């Protein structure tokens, strides 16, 4: 992970000057505030601010003036109810802001989640660093034959080395050309034009602020095993932060979203028929092959 000297100085300054506040704070979050967590080869993720806690969710749900009940178990029970019944607005009362360094191709997946505020490092005004994402050997994988947007098994070592060399060579050459285009003693091309030649594995940075409800939606999709590895590792780190920030909400989220599976009306009929002792197959279930395999993977542990 490469932090600039300016970023390190900023982090140290922020951590050395605690702020007085009357608002609720979370001790675990205060301890990790501003701390960069390494992700991928040059990326990082750090919390720069947050608002609210589990108590804020409860307070909003009850529209109360206090901080919830005196019994943590009652507050946790209400949060579980809200999560189970897919209430959203109480969770929207909490917000968190991240500083993220990530490859451009990951950023383009990430930005599809539109319910957030984002401000990205501008290559129109500044020059991007010579930093590129190169996957680890075990992540250099073949295209999946069953999933058009997924990968399969890792390639053999020799092929993986060749792939990595191509990625490294192309990224380096494009950055050399980027510098050459920018050189005021040479072509002196505008930054907003010179950047278009850079590869998608170039690292960018942004500040990303989102409410708790939409954060959990993001995590449910991007921490899923089917999500691309390079964005999933960011989501997994964010789940660790979620547990420190709102532990009761995080527990309910894991119970009712991450570790859960939604049955369609047709799937529920199949379950009831099986409970009644009927032998149900995909052919007589009324489900498509994909629906059947997804349900079987959950109910029977089959693929």
Swiss-Prot record:
<dbReference type="GO" id="GO:0004799">
    <property type="term" value="F:thymidylate synthase activity"/>
</dbReference>
<dbReference type="GO" id="GO:0050797">
    <property type="term" value="F:thymidylate synthase (FAD) activity"/>
</dbReference>
<dbReference type="GO" id="GO:0006235">
    <property type="term" value="P:dTTP biosynthetic process"/>
</dbReference>
<feature type="active site" description="Involved in ionization of N3 of dUMP, leading to its activation">
    <location>
        <position position="222"/>
    </location>
</feature>
<feature type="binding site" description="in other chain">
    <location>
        <position position="195"/>
    </location>
    <ligand>
        <name>dUMP</name>
    </ligand>
</feature>
<feature type="region of interest" description="Disordered">
    <location>
        <begin position="1"/>
        <end position="21"/>
    </location>
</feature>
<keyword id="KW-0285">Flavoprotein</keyword>
<feature type="short sequence motif" description="ThyX motif">
    <location>
        <begin position="112"/>
        <end position="122"/>
    </location>
</feature>
<keyword id="KW-0808">Transferase</keyword>
<keyword id="KW-0489">Methyltransferase</keyword>
<dbReference type="Pfam" id="PF02511">
    <property type="entry name" value="Thy1"/>
</dbReference>
<dbReference type="GO" id="GO:0032259">
    <property type="term" value="P:methylation"/>
</dbReference>
<keyword id="KW-0521">NADP</keyword>
<keyword id="KW-0545">Nucleotide biosynthesis</keyword>
<feature type="binding site">
    <location>
        <begin position="112"/>
        <end position="114"/>
    </location>
    <ligand>
        <name>FAD</name>
    </ligand>
</feature>
<comment type="pathway">
    <text>Pyrimidine metabolism; dTTP biosynthesis.</text>
</comment>
<feature type="binding site">
    <location>
        <position position="217"/>
    </location>
    <ligand>
        <name>FAD</name>
    </ligand>
</feature>
<comment type="function">
    <text>Catalyzes the reductive methylation of 2'-deoxyuridine-5'-monophosphate (dUMP) to 2'-deoxythymidine-5'-monophosphate (dTMP) while utilizing 5,10-methylenetetrahydrofolate (mTHF) as the methyl donor, and NADPH and FADH(2) as the reductant.</text>
</comment>
<comment type="similarity">
    <text>Belongs to the thymidylate synthase ThyX family.</text>
</comment>
<feature type="binding site">
    <location>
        <position position="222"/>
    </location>
    <ligand>
        <name>dUMP</name>
    </ligand>
</feature>
<keyword id="KW-0274">FAD</keyword>
<dbReference type="GO" id="GO:0006231">
    <property type="term" value="P:dTMP biosynthetic process"/>
</dbReference>
<dbReference type="GO" id="GO:0070402">
    <property type="term" value="F:NADPH binding"/>
</dbReference>
<dbReference type="GO" id="GO:0050660">
    <property type="term" value="F:flavin adenine dinucleotide binding"/>
</dbReference>
<feature type="binding site">
    <location>
        <position position="89"/>
    </location>
    <ligand>
        <name>FAD</name>
    </ligand>
</feature>
<protein>
    <recommendedName>
        <fullName>Flavin-dependent thymidylate synthase</fullName>
        <ecNumber>2.1.1.148</ecNumber>
    </recommendedName>
</protein>
<feature type="domain" description="ThyX">
    <location>
        <begin position="43"/>
        <end position="256"/>
    </location>
</feature>
<comment type="subunit">
    <text>Homotetramer.</text>
</comment>
<feature type="binding site">
    <location>
        <begin position="109"/>
        <end position="112"/>
    </location>
    <ligand>
        <name>dUMP</name>
    </ligand>
</feature>
<feature type="binding site">
    <location>
        <begin position="211"/>
        <end position="213"/>
    </location>
    <ligand>
        <name>FAD</name>
    </ligand>
</feature>
<dbReference type="InterPro" id="IPR003669">
    <property type="entry name" value="Thymidylate_synthase_ThyX"/>
</dbReference>
<feature type="binding site" description="in other chain">
    <location>
        <begin position="120"/>
        <end position="124"/>
    </location>
    <ligand>
        <name>dUMP</name>
    </ligand>
</feature>
<feature type="binding site">
    <location>
        <position position="120"/>
    </location>
    <ligand>
        <name>FAD</name>
    </ligand>
</feature>
<dbReference type="InterPro" id="IPR036098">
    <property type="entry name" value="Thymidylate_synthase_ThyX_sf"/>
</dbReference>
């Amino acid at each position: 992970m490469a932090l600039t000297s300016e970023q390190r100085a900023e982090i140290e300054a922020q951590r050395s000057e605690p702020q007085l506040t009357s608002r609720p704070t979370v001790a675990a979050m205060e301890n990790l505030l501003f701390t960069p967590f390494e992700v991928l080869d040059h990326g990082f993720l750090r919390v720069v601010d947050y608002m609210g806690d589990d108590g804020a969710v409860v307070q909003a749900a009850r529209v109360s003036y206090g901080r919830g009940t005196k019994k943590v178990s009652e507050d946790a029970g209400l949060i579980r109810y809200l999560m189970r019944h897919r209430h959203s607005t109480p969770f929207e009362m909490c917000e968190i802001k991240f500083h993220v360094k990530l490859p451009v191709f990951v950023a383009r997946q990430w930005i599809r989640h539109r319910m957030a505020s984002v401000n990205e490092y501008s290559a129109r005004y500044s020059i991007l660093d010579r930093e590129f994402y190169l996957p680890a050997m075990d992540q250099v994988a073949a295209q999946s034959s069953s999933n058009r947007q997924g990968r399969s098994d890792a390639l053999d070592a020799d092929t993986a080395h060749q792939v990595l060399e191509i990625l490294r060579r192309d990224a380096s050459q494009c950055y050399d050309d980027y510098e050459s285009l920018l050189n005021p003693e040479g072509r002196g091309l505008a930054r907003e034009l010179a950047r278009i030649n850079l590869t998608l594995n170039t690292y960018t940075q942004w500040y990303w602020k989102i409410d708790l409800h939409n954060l959990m939606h993001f995590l449910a999709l991007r921490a899923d095993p089917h999500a691309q590895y390079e964005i999933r590792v960011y989501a997994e780190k964010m789940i660790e932060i979620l547990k420190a920030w709102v532990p009761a909400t995080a527990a309910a989220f894991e119970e009712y979203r991450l570790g859960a599976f939604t049955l369609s009306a047709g799937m529920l009929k199949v379950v009831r028929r099986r409970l009644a002792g009927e032998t149900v197959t995909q052919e007589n279930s009324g489900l498509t092959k994909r629906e059947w395999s997804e349900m079987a993977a959950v109910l029977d542990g089959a693929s």
